[in-house]
């Protein structure tokens, strides 16, 4: 049997530079931006007819899709509750 000194120093030193959370999913370098994508004006609405096709059988309803008075009533019922001292 060869006698080699038992040392964990190298194993510990090898792991010093690993940042916290490095092994979590999604850790690492962010995805690179694709520079070859065509530039699209952000202010211009889409002009293709495919995106504006109405759904068959759908009806256009007047007003917003949400009842605003219900939201306002619930909002008025909310109160600020201070944190209880322990």
Swiss-Prot record:
Protein family: Belongs to the SMPX family.
Q: What does this protein do?
A: Plays a role in the regulatory network through which muscle cells coordinate their structural and functional states during growth, adaptation, and repair.
Q: Name one Pfam family in it.
A: Chisel
Q: Which organism is it from?
A: Bos taurus
This protein's source sits in the domain of life called: Eukaryota
Which cellular components does GO assign to this protein? Answer: costamere; M band; muscle tendon junction
**What transmembrane ranges does the database entry give?**
none
Annotated stretches, region: Disordered = 20-64
* Entry protein name: Small muscular protein
């Amino acid at each position: 049997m060869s006698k080699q000194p038992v040392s964990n120093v190298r194993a510990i030193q090898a792991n010093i530079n690993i940042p916290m959370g490095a092994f979590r999913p999604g850790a690492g370098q962010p995805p690179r931006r694709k520079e070859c994508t065509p530039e699209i004006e952000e202010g211009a609405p889409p002009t293709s007819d495919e995106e504006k096709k109405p759904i068959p059988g759908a009806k256009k309803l007047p007003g917003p899709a949400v009842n605003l008075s219900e939201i306002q009533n619930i909002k008025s019922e909310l109160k600020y509750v201070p944190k209880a001292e322990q």
